[in-house]
Regions:
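Radical SAM enzyme [4Fe-4S]-AdoMet core and its adjacent flexible, acidic
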Residues: 9, 24-43, 53-55, 60, ...
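Conserved SAM-binding loop
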Residues: 10, 70, 92
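A short acidic, amphipathic alpha-helical/loop segment
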Residues: 48, 75-82, 102-107, 171-172
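Acidic-and-aromatic substrate-binding clefts and catalytic sites of carbohydrate-active enzymes
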Residues: 68-74, 97-102, 162-167, 192-196
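A short glycine-rich beta-strand->turn/loop micro-motif centered on a GG-aromatic cluster
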Residues: 91-96, 185-187
């Protein structure tokens, strides 16, 4: 039987102004004029997913998208709950600075490791994270990630490596182990904003290799 994964973009709303995100105008920091800011209605999505798992094996369902953070959707809980009626492996990708610790704790307790939440946090402090994820409350994002780590849910920390934060890689690895993050993914930024000096790339790659052994 064919194994298929789906990535649903639920919203084009986002509180962040990431400079190389396709939704952000690099000059103004505001959403691009062409972007229609809207949420996908839950009722419409629910109707459109009827029979989705017929004759196929769903590997996973991911709520991410290109122009918005799924946690901005007011009905995100309903989307997750319904997705679990036809798939047992759900993933949410978020900047972490939305909702509160109670929400993450409750969802982790309810679904355990079958619900993976990917936290895109690019620093170990507010100042560093803000350099790319402008608009995200770092303390809130961090507390939400810690709360999810303390639940039975599966936590992934995505750390995008820029020219200004690569020296934090060892501390990221240490903190991730301290708070019981299940998995850390280090991704070297390829966009123009904060592009890593090519001369440092081999050093950074070695640091990542070392971090993955911690």
């Amino acid at each position: 039987m064919t194994r298929i994964a789906f990535d649903f973009a639920l919203t084009s709303y986002c509180q962040s102004r990431c400079k190389t995100c396709p939704r952000t105008n690099n000059e103004t920091g505001e959403p691009e004029d062409w972007l229609v800011i809207r949420h996908v209605p839950f009722s419409k999505w629910k109707k459109n997913t009827i029979g989705l798992s017929d004759n196929i094996e769903l590997e996973y369902i991911k709520f991410c998208g290109q122009t918005g953070d799924p946690m901005m959707h007011p009905d995100i809980t309903e989307f997750v709950n319904h997705a679990f009626t036809f798939c047992n492996n759900i993933m949410i990708s978020t900047n972490g600075g939305l909702r509160n610790t109670d929400w993450y704790t409750e969802m982790g307790n309810k679904y355990g490791e079958e619900l993976k939440i990917v936290f895109a946090i690019d620093g170990i402090d507010h100042e560093t994270n803000w350099k790319y994820r402008e608009g995200v409350d770092f303390n809130k994002a961090w507390n939400n990630m810690v709360a999810y780590c303390n639940s039975p849910g599966y936590t992934q920390w995505d750390f995008l490596v820029f020219d200004w934060n690569w020296k934090q890689i060892p501390e990221v690895a240490r903190l991730a182990k301290e708070i019981n993050v299940d998995e850390v993914i280090y991704k070297i930024n390829t966009g123009p904003h904060g592009l890593l000096d090519p001369a440092k790339k081999s050093i950074v790659e070695e640091m990542i290799c070392q971090a993955n052994t911690i």
